């Protein structure tokens, strides 16, 4: 975790000094890889820091305050962009870009240090090789075990892949809808910022609801909410309607991610959380290519992005069905030794 985060911060800062688009792209990809690698380990920490009955609440609070906190570097970077040559022109492009990436890296460091000082790993497998090859063998062995012996986790991962694919596709293409309706660059960023704030509020709401309702019930609400957002996208004609859609996305954006993480933590063996969450993040980060394929196919056929977003309702419907199936499957006995 520490190595991935440290490298990510370094490469994040270096993107601000890239002198060509190719170098910037390479540095950005490396930064993203390091960020994703650190998140895989970060997600697996949930079982170490709380009890099963509080996982939903803790996970939801984590996403909530993460969304709110991210608004701070977001705003600073936005101000730097506005002051840059593309808008006001008070500061040069290099300084404008440099402020954005430096503040992002500094924020990343600031929120990582308390975790490093306060976290103690409790659940782990002893006596295992720490090599990269051994780690990949472990992950593939875990995948084989899930496919053959753990249908609950298998059905959930497939469900998660489908509905989180829909979530990622909507988030990635929401701005495209706004652009088609006449939203400029600053307006796009402000909509994203407002969505973060809405996600903060409703993640806290779902954190409170998790004390009284089951994880699957709350996940069902989130999935149905996104399904309704997809259908509502079919009617979009102006920026007011787009704002309502963005509000709907924000309502469930943090909660569907936090509750998925906490539910997964509950159904996996704690001592193998690392490799299980490796698979979880593969399903998560690998998602959105199906949705992107739908977007591309619809646009190629002459349709609008509104229709494409509407078709994503099928992803949420299928994900919801498989989630309910997973919830009805009995918990498997974990026997992973020797993988």
What are the functions of these language-model segments?
Residues 107-118, 310-339:
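Multi-pass alpha-helical transporter architecture, strongest
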Residues 201-215, 299:
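Helix-to-loop junctions at the C-terminal end of transmembrane segments
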Residues 121-157:
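Juxtamembrane intracellular "pre-TM" segments in multi-pass secondary transporters
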Residues 80-106, 297-316:
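A membrane-interface helix-boundary motif in multi-pass transporters
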Residues 172-188:
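Short amphipathic helix-loop junctions that connect adjacent transmembrane helices
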Residues 1-13, 217-232:
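Structural signature of the two symmetry-related core transmembrane helices
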Residues 59-81, 281-291:
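Glycine-rich segments within core transmembrane alpha-helices of 12-TM secondary carriers
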Residues 14-28, 234-245:
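Helix-loop junctions at membrane interfaces in 12-TM secondary transporters
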